[in-house]
């Protein structure tokens, strides 16, 4: 069994709250060889490092409804995009809804029921998995998709910017034989994306199943 370094995770949370991401880890890692360190959404991309790049709403769905539904599932899942969508909610004059039966999928997405509507929120791959038709010729690298009752309702294009501290800090952790564990909840933050887009050594990081990642990233966990 892996010996997860909760002390590292607590340090990471404090650092991320100040916008420093992984800045304090290399020194701490040196004294704990062979351990593991948990990396959450906000450790990689603190608030301000993910920006909204555009919104497109489809069919007869209103912007307020699509934004409200999407923001609700993002909030309820504890995803690192929560602040971004909360700010969007306010600017669009939308409100959070009451969602039931939230489910997190291994394929990169979420589902819940809102006022009798079956709502899906996730990546393009998740929409394909759930057989939601997507526009032909769609060319968006990172986005949040929303479908309502099996019909595509909205696309939120995102731009992720990696803080300067993250790459060298992860390199230091690996050099000190401290294995990063991706305890991410943002369904876009998968090893393939981190390696291809940001050249991070994601192949040397553990990426547990979705429910285990949720357990590890639970802020109430001791």
Where is each model-derived feature located?
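Residue-level signature of catalytic and energy-coupling elements of molecular machines
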Residues: 12, 43, 116, 146, ...
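ATP-binding catalytic core of ATPases
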Residues: 59-110, 114, 129-130, 185, ...
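Conserved cytosolic catalytic loops of P-type ATPases
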Residues: 26-69, 113
């Amino acid at each position: 069994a892996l010996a997860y370094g909760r002390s590292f995770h607590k340090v990471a949370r404090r650092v991320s709250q100040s916008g420093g991401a992984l800045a304090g880890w290399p020194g701490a890692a040196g004294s704990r060889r062979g351990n593991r360190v948990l990396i959450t959404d906000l450790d990689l991309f603190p608030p301000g490092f993910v920006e909204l790049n555009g919104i497109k709403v489809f069919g007869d769905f209103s912007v307020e409804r699509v934004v409200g539904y999407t923001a609700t599932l993002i909030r309820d899942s504890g995803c690192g995009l929560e602040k971004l969508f909360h700010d969007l909610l306010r600017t669009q004059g939308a409100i959070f809804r009451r969602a039931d039966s939230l489910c997190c999928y291994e394929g990169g997405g979420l589902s819940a029921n809102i006022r009798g509507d079956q709502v899906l929120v996730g990546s393009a791959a998740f929409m394909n998995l759930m057989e939601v038709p997507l526009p032909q010729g769609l060319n968006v690298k990172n986005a949040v998709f929303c479908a309502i009752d099996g019909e595509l309702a909205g696309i939120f294009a995102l731009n992720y910017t990696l803080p300067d501290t993250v790459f060298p800090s992860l390199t230091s952790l690996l050099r000190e034989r401290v294995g990063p564990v991706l305890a991410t909840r943002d369904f876009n933050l998968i090893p393939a994306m981190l390696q291809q887009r940001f050249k991070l050594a994601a192949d040397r990081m553990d990426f547990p199943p979705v429910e285990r990642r949720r357990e590890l990233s639970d802020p109430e966990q001791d």
